[in-house]
UniProtKB/Swiss-Prot annotation:
Cofactor: heme
Binding site for heme: C342
Source organism of the structure: Panax ginseng
Protein name, as recorded: Cytochrome P450 CYP82D47
Nucleotide-binding listed as a keyword: no
Length: 363
């Protein structure tokens, strides 16, 4: 997976493919219909649940974490491989779909479990809890599924003319790897691992942040009311939110920034490795040391942020300078910084703004 690949010519080539071809503004624009259609399906599902199960007060309990997870996973799967397995709508329900749902849910479950051997490596041979065995089994099943997708895409390419407007990420990767030096790595392995890391990272980050954003708004009703008033003023009540509206939703942008500040999806970021001995703030750091940046602490530093533990989107409206989340301002780096900046930042922000705006506007 290129996210954990050391800096090298191979990493540079793979990063170039990911940033300039898979997650470029043009590619995201071509696949805009995927985001819009999945958002519409989810809103219809949510309304259907409400209309069937509402009580006398007109309220109904909904597990939004699962809804956000299914929504983002469907969007990412369609963009990566043209597949749709989760939620309602026209989701497949054949054997492949059921298998894929089971495997991906198991993957995300294992992704968050506490493994004793991570803290006490000498106990690894015991495999306490059976997690290592489960991870190996899940990894093998995931590889089989993605291998099937890859073979399916190859057959489709060989039997029809290419249509660039209908290409998903796997189609793009099949073309892109022909023209780059993979430094001895197998092309199929590179394509599969890249697609898998895009699915895993894209789904988890967006789903987690949407859950936190909604939770924060429900616990701060004044901010919720202000966001809905902005939506009524910008969008109105006669139509649904469009992506073209998002740039005009200033307060909504502040809500997303404040959510990313308080609850960054990767609270310790992506680990970095020192390639040479150096001195940082008076401390000697030897070559090979792994570095983790504590984003949780950085984003709640009282020297930088006033009332750092409070949810106050207004702080981003009243700052003397605009602070973005794209790695230009080191006090707020939820997506990382430098050449290891998350390549999916544009996609992530588009999804966060579109889903939250549509949800608040509709309900």
């Amino acid at each position: 997976m290129f996210a954990f690949t050391p800096y090298s010519s191979f990493w540079v080539e793979l990063r170039k493919i990911t940033s300039l071809q898979l997650l470029s503004s043009r590619r995201l624009e071509l696949l805009k219909h995927v985001r819009i259609s999945e958002m519409e399906i989810s809103m219809k599902q949510l309304y259907k649940i409400w209309s069937k199960k509402k009580d006398g007060s007109g309220r109904v309990l909904v597990e939004m974490k699962k809804l956000f997870g299914d929504l983002t996973l469907n969007v990412v799967l369609r963009m990566v491989a043209g597949k749709r397995y989760f939620g309602g709508g026209n989701a497949n329900d054949d054997e492949e779909a059921r298998r894929c749902r089971r495997v991906w849910r198991e993957f995300f479950r294992l992704h968050g479990v506490f493994v004793v051997a991570d803290s006490l490596p000498f106990l690894r041979w015991l495999d306490l809890g059976g997690y290592e065995k489960a991870m190996k089994k899940t990894a093998k099943e995931m590889d089989n599924i993605v291998s099937g997708w890859l073979e399916e895409h190859r057959m489709k390419r060989n039997s029809s003319d290419e249509d660039n407007t209908q290409q998903d990420f796997m189609d793009v990767m099949l073309s892109a790897v022909k023209n780059v030096d993979l430094c001895g790595f197998d092309a199929d392995v590179v394509i599969k691992s890249t697609c898998m890391v895009l699915i895993a990272s894209g789904t988890d980050t967006v789903g987690v942040e949407l859950t936190w954003a909604l939770s924060l708004l429900l616990n701060n009703r004044h901010a919720l009311k202000k966001a809905q008033e902005e939506l009524d003023n910008v969008v109105g009540k006669q139509r649904q939110v469009k992506e073209s509206d998002l740039n005009n939703l200033v307060y909504l942008h502040a809500i997303i920034k404040e959510t990313l500040r308080l609850y960054p999806a990767a609270q310790l970021g992506v680990r970095r490795e020192f390639y040479e001995d150096c001195t940082v703030a008076g401390y000697h750091v030897p070559k090979g040391t792994l570095l983790a940046v504590n984003l949780w602490t950085l984003h709640r530093d009282p020297i930088i942020w006033s009332d750092p533990t409070e949810f106050r989107p207004e702080r981003f409206l009243n700052m003397p300078k605009e602070v973005d989340v794209k790695g230009q301002h080191f006090e707020l780096i939820p997506f990382g910084v430098g050449r290891r900046l998350c390549p999916g930042i544009a996609f992530g922000l588009q999804m966060l703004h579109l889903v939250l705006a549509t949800l608040l506007h509709g309900f």
